[in-house]
């Protein structure tokens, strides 16, 4: 096989591999997650004695932590800069919520938030 042909095969293989790497991100798409609204600092555990967990969430967010969603044993950091969404998350602190968005590892890019019924 000529050097040029090997280069073509390697380039084609690389393009195929790159395309396959994108498929999981495309397949993931928008999902709805139901869980408890928390913050990324405390996650599922609000252990400071005498502090209401909802107040703890709000205080941690005020100090710079991002909101989070606790789904079973998993804690997702919620990524949004939309003020209406942030206001809704503040209102739902330590309550059950439905969050719609796209998951990227442990982070959800939030599209919408609503109280879970």
Describe the residue ranges of each PLM region.
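Hydrophobic h-region of N-terminal signal peptides that target proteins for export
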Residues: 15-24
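Bacterial N-terminal signal peptides that target proteins for export
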Residues: 2-15
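Conserved RNA-binding domains used in RNP assembly and mRNA/RNA metabolism
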Residues: 23-117
